[in-house]
């Protein structure tokens, strides 16, 4: 019981770290898209760049809501929120990696080198997908939990 509560806290913490990675990636790609010009206009005027930034922001906000909701419902005196602690870590870590990946794409070659740090953010996000349980472990845990409770609030 004590160990499960610690796992729930760890997974929530990793999800919160994922939010930081995603937020920083969005800030970097947004700034770059405003500063960098191609064909006489800022990158932010191009549809694919807009898509990368908008999707990243929407996913970040969804992840933030999930992290805050899970944190608000966490009971520190007992375990019992395994479904959401697994789910929030699964979603947020994957989201952060995808957002960092988009940031690399927006920055092009600069995204791959250390000058803008998004390559490091991507590596950090990838590590968060593994730490605290792999995505596959979270899929298994969540499916087991859902099959026994079938609670969809």
Residue ranges and their predicted role:
Residues 5-153:
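Alpha-helical interface subdomain recognition
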